[in-house]
Amino acid sequence: MNPSRIRVKMCGMTRSEDIQYAIDLGVDAIGLIFYPKSARNVSLEKARIIVNNIPPFVDIVAVLVNPEQSFVQLIINEIPVQLLQFHGEESSEFCRQFNKPFIKAIHPKTAIQIQSAVDEFFDASAILLDTPSDKGRGGTGLTFDWNIIPENLSKPYILAGGLNESNILEAITMCHPYAVDVCSGIEASPGVKDHLKMSRFIKAIWG
């Protein structure tokens, strides 16, 4: 795969100016975290404001962790999201009930766990591979173990976990993911993006 075709999602957005800068850089997707325990959590009210000027062909992804069905439906009704990303222990039945394209994030320690998730979430748009950690659900800055990813997975996968400007080219060269998802690697502090880091991250991928 040509690294120039790697799709990029920048996650944990909380500010309009960071979203706009990401759009100017050419990212494919913006992630909003709807999880009160996260330092990057956004309310529905804030989400409505910061996504107001997102143009066509930039996907809005709602990131959720073991949410109530009613809360997911509320987000779908209130925010123009293109994708749902489930980051907890949600079942395949739960994820598919909303008739919305979804990504299932997993935190595997073995190749068998990755293949099992691909089989279970057969109708997911993609599987997201993130680092197992007791520190939190994503955005930990801990690097994923690329060596456990099976070859020739039948489903597109998104690589996450500790990606930054220094390791992103090595990651995509070694793993050949469909897309990459970056959060803490482009931040000044949780939820506040560093525009220089954002630029360097994109330049490392696309030149």
Curated annotation (Swiss-Prot):
Tell me a GO biological process for this protein.
L-tryptophan biosynthetic process
Q: Which InterPro entries match?
A: Aldolase_TIM, PRAI_dom, RibuloseP-bd_barrel, TrpF_fam
Family matches, as PANTHER family: N-(5'-PHOSPHORIBOSYL)ANTHRANILATE ISOMERASE
Q: List the disulfide bonds.
A: none
Quote the protein name from its UniProt record. N-(5'-phosphoribosyl)anthranilate isomerase
**CDD domains per record:** PRAI
What is an example of a Pfam family matching this protein? PRAI
Pathway assignment reads:
Amino-acid biosynthesis; L-tryptophan biosynthesis; L-tryptophan from chorismate: step 3/5
Q: List the Gene Ontology MF annotations in alphabetical order.
A: phosphoribosylanthranilate isomerase activity
Give the species this sequence originates from: Legionella pneumophila (strain Lens)
Name the residues that span the membrane.
none
Sorted keywords for this record are: Amino-acid biosynthesis, Aromatic amino acid biosynthesis, Isomerase, Tryptophan biosynthesis
User: Which protein family is it in?
Assistant: Belongs to the TrpF family.
Q: Which reaction does it catalyse?
A: N-(5-phospho-beta-D-ribosyl)anthranilate = 1-(2-carboxyphenylamino)-1-deoxy-D-ribulose 5-phosphate
Top EC class for this record? isomerase
- What are its E.C. numbers? 5.3.1.24
